[in-house]
A protein has these predicted regions:
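Acidic, contiguous internal or C-terminal segments within carbohydrate-active enzymes
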Residues: 220-266
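N-terminal secretory signal peptides that target proteins for export/translocation
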Residues: 1-13
Length: 514
């Protein structure tokens, strides 16, 4: 039976951080043969793994290493002068993470001229700091993960570009950005009574770049009790860093929710959910979920930090893209000189080919502080092949800071909540939504604009209007909403319209229950 296939790509072009302590997974793969190495080589391994019973990887580590505490482990650092390809002055370099309490065995390989060779662990590649250990007696531990370096912000220094560390997590940087949101290879049953399953990248193959290379190719093998997979990552650094992903999955057993291209990020509070006691006005890596449907609609959902876990979704026949964005890029919105939340990148997934019908699912989990990643978003296809049959999909993953993906017309600049001149009852809330963008800037003076709003569930619109804010040029949608049942969440939708012309994306807001 042929693969359930989406078209393939062209040529290269913190969910709580504690969850990185995922269950140990697949066994290490033996050294590769002399056959030419390519994506299909990894896919063959994934298919073979899927046909065999799942076998957890032996996670034993030397007693000396296991006895190290968190700070002692952090004192182990890769020696930069030992970086892969540094001696050859290639544009990309790779350094490795040492295994530790949260980093299970990951096997590394290098691909040169279509031939793969194993990269063994060498204790001499690491500086163990003040730790009094004897790593030369530990044998081949393999590694905990990897990070790629590239001269992203200037020729004098090779910055971190992309990191693969823990389960199937990875994150990247574009020029000028600081680490924020993460992505994963796959999410399995993120919500549910049985708990989430965390697939792991258990083996990587790093393709040696040419001396003038502008992109780096990485292959990875994914494994878990119910899914195996082959991945190809083509990383193109720049003002916008592009990671083009090709994947082929094989299910060992059925899963309830298969989440493709998952994002993980943090939202503690912001202008739509202010904090009373912190001097910082906002604390978040991302402030909204943006979705583009195949029907041409653009949706913006402001993120929230709920009391109880909230799972919502946007169903559609076709997906044009979705992403977790940090639209507010003003330092004064955060006032954090260390975290610099205004420099956190946005991530946008652009499917390659048709992904068919499905839904974008958003999971929001309450968090007391900024140390936990509490937001997850991913695509769930309606149709998943049965165990043993392949599922192919590809996408472009855009990491952006200076030029964010936006709708072609108007888009939400901010969402604020709270009373104005008039007091609010316990079952009422007022929402202030500012829209900006080319479709609004081009309106002639005096153009009539109206707010089109609805409360599809548990809400009554008491007042809604739209007007231009003279000080900023934005158009403001103001609505007052009553909640019949204050214990339940309320879905709200709104956009601006002039005559028959829709001027903006749809503001899709979730007002949590008490």
């Amino acid at each position: 039976m042929p693969p359930t296939s989406f078209p393939q790509p062209s040529a290269p072009r913190r969910f709580a951080r504690a969850l990185l302590v995922a269950a140990s997974l697949a066994a290490p793969i033996s050294a590769w043969s002399a056959a030419p190495f390519a994506f299909d080589s990894v896919a063959a391994l994934a298919r073979k793994q899927a046909r065999a019973p799942y076998k957890a990887l032996d996670a034993k580590e030397p007693a000396e290493l296991a006895a190290l505490n968190y700070d002692e482990y952090r004192d182990i650092r890769f020696r930069p002068d030992h970086a892969l390809w540094r001696a050859e002055s290639l544009p990309f370099e790779v350094m490795f993470f040492h295994r530790g309490a949260n980093n299970l065995r990951v096997r590394m390989n290098e691909v040169v001229a279509d031939k793969a060779r194993h990269l063994p662990y060498k204790s001499a590649d690491f500086d163990f700091g003040k730790n009094t250990v004897k790593p030369e007696t530990w044998g081949d531990l393999d590694f905990g993960g990897l990070r790629v370096h590239y001269a992203l912000n200037g020729p004098a220094y090779k910055d971190e570009l992309v990191v693969f560390l823990g389960a199937s997590y990875f994150r990247a940087l574009c020029a000028g950005a600081r680490y924020g949101l993460s992505t994963r290879g796959l999410a399995i049953d993120t919500v549910g009574a049985n708990g989430e399953e965390f697939p792991r990248f258990v083996e990587f193959w790093l393709v040696k770049p040419a001396a003038d290379a502008k992109a780096l190719r990485i292959f990875a093998l994914l494994d878990s009790p119910r899914v195996t997979g082959a991945y190809q990552f083509d990383v193109v650094p720049g003002e916008e860093t592009l990671v083009e992903v090709r994947a082929r999955l094989y299910l060992r057993a059925a899963v309830r929710t298969l989440g493709l291209a998952p994002f993980t990020t943090m939202y503690q509070y912001g202008e739509n959910q202010p904090h009373r006691f912190d001097f910082r006005p906002e604390v978040h890596d991302s402030d909204g979920l943006m979705v583009a449907t195949g029907d041409g609609e653009w949706l913006w959902r402001p993120l929230v930090n709920p009391r109880e876990t909230l799972t919502t979704s946007f169903a559609m026949r076709e997906l044009r893209g979705f992403g977790v964005m940090q639209r507010d890029q003003r330092f004064t919105s955060y006032e954090d000189n260390e975290a610099r939340y205004e420099l956190r990148p946005s991530g946008w997934v652009e499917p390659i080919g048709s992904w068919g019908p499905g839904r974008v699912e958003l999971v929001q989990i309450g968090t007391p502080d900024e140390t936990n990643d509490n937001i997850v978003a991913y695509w769930v296809p309606d149709h998943v092949p049965p165990p043993g049959e392949p599922l192919d999909f590809s996408y472009r993953l855009h990491w952006q800071l200076h030029e964010l993906k936006k709708p072609p017309g108007g888009y939400v600049a901010q969402t604020r909540v709270g009373r104005g001149y008039r007091p609010l009852a316990d079952d009422e809330q007022q929402f202030i939504v500012d829209f900006v963008g080319p479709s609004l800037a081009a309106l002639p003076p005096g153009t009539p604009v109206k707010a089109v709003v609805s409360a599809p569930s548990n809400g009554e619109i008491e007042e809604a209007n739209a007007y231009r804010v003279d000080a900023t040029g934005a158009w403001r949608m103001m609505l007052r909403v009553k909640k019949p049942d204050i214990t339940k969440p309320t879905e709200l939708r709104g956009f601006l319209q002039s005559g028959n012309d829709v001027l903006t994306e749809t503001w899709s807001n979730l007002w949590p229950g008490r």
